Amino acid sequence: MIKHFIILSCLTLFASIQAAGFEHFITRSGDRLMEGNREFRFISFNVPNLHYIEDNLAYDAVHPWRLPDEFEIRDALESVRQAGGRAVRIYTLSVRKKDDLEGIPRHVLGPGLFNEEAFLALDRVLAVANETGIRLIIPFVDNWSWWGGIAEYASFRNKPKEAFWNDPEVIADFKRTVSYVINRKNTITGIPYREDRAVLAWETGNELQCPAAWTREIAGFIKSLDPNHLVMDGFFTSILRDESISEPLVDIVTSHHYPADPEDLLSETRRNRDRTAGIKPYVVGEFGFVPTDAVRRFLDQTIADGVSGALIWSLRFHNRDGGFYWHSEPFGGDLYKAYLWPGFPSGEKYDETNLLGLMAEKAYALSGAVPEPAVPAAPVLLPFGDVSRISWKGSAGAQAYDVERSESAGGPWILAGAGISDADLQYRPLFNDEKAQAGRDYFYRVLARNRAGQSGPSNVVGPVRAGSHILVDEMNGVSKCYAYNKRLEIDTRESRKFREDMHRLKSGKGAWILYHVPGAIKSWTVYTFYPEPGPDFLYYSSETDQSLEPVTAKAARLDGGKGDYGYWIPVRFHGESSGGHSYLKIEWPCPAEIGRIEIEYGD
């Protein structure tokens, strides 16, 4: 019953609410956050990539960093709005690192040097936040070096990481960043950040291991520049320190929780709330990697105890190139990934759909109103020239899509693919129209749907000529293979190392797979991953499954380095054939994994 109720709750939260902008800044009164004369409380998400993407893991991407566009920002905040969220926390401002590859866009390039293009994306985030009615918690700097942080500020002056806390020159450099941000005038709205009501609070940083004296100095500096906004202490702890609670320049205290025992989440946050009651607002800034039932008990306690807010880690959003951005959590036990609204079968292992339904249920319990369900907006079909590579920009809240084709731009339309999830594949084309007839021209459109109904149709793309047929194998089984030896393993572990590819075929030297297609093979492409540089895969073809002959394929190595996650090396092989062969054998030369195979064939 509980599971059924959560799903139904999730599916009824897709309504469109007219956002009228913000009338008030968020203020504090004792231990409460206030929006005018009403208390402001929230249950919502960390959306770390809202202003800066670390998950652009397309197979041929040199590095995973890029800036979000307006579609992505709107999709993220619309997803939060549908889930009842009233506030989100983004991640920190990125800082240039010594080993950055060329083309990585960072916010802070050096002392007092800032990347205007990156801040234009933050301008857009604030503009859309005002439109959608979502407040932002913005932390200034990271304790860690994922995106560049305190060590990079110190490195600009050739000083050790610890200098960030007490060296006058390094502190002055950081203050230049704080001043630049607070005094920046939004290029879209014309509103200075210090006057933007979409900002809930400035957070001194993320998971800072800082002295209390540093917090006092930086909090005072922020307030000297901006009397409108609250200051949140970004000190890293699960049990609040006394100095944070008693510091008058700190308005909000926060804690982060990823417990091995879910009971610790309840006991630690209750202790924190007891210590802050009557003194100042308390926000659980990050929590996660616990079962759905534990999240339910935690949120019930959070609501009952008067905690101002709770933000689960974390939410990703639709990708402008189709599908979603994906993020496996390195500290989530090789189980949890960033959540994708409204939840999909691909997240079944970590109970994604029920968890997101629960988050929405409790968020709306705070606001006291559950909106009526609404159908998703129409998706946007992306340009394509091959009917095996169809993708679209997804619709926030959509659970599935129908792809339609016609031989005329005006119809009539027939169903080419039904109930397609845009969360099944990672950084791949979403649909292959296997039933399109070679040599014919087609037009395509896509419709989104959820329990409330079906959207209007997308834009129409076409005419697109269907060429040869394409067999596509995403390696989530061996059903498409004609034959194989017994040394194969479907690998779903540590997806981050493989550009978030959730299903790969793993084996070692001498292992093989054999494909057979109902026509002459014209070309093939194999997407592989190597732990270290190694010899090329071997390829053989024939008209029968006997007497296979060696054939050649060109290798394209796309190594961008191991990065922070130990990325394996992507090597893409492409071969062509004109011999009328219909069998293709692929042999491993060494330990490696295959993520996708495409075989083009025809008459």
Tell where the protein language model's regions lie, with residue ranges.
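Substrate-binding cleft of secreted/luminal carbohydrate-active enzymes
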Residues: 283-359, 363
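Pro/Thr/Ser/Gly-rich low-complexity, intrinsically disordered linker/stalk tracts
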Residues: 364-397, 438, 453-467
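Recognizes extended acidic, P/S/T-rich segments that occur
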Residues: 402-439, 451-457
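Active-site mouth of glycoside hydrolases
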Residues: 22-252, 256-264, 278-281, 287-294, ...
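Extracellular carbohydrate-recognition regions
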Residues: 464-493
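Short beta-strands within extracellular/lumenal beta-sheet-rich domains
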Residues: 497-523, 570
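Exposed low-complexity, polar/acidic, P/S/T/G-rich flexible segments that act as propeptides
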Residues: 524, 579-581, 588-603
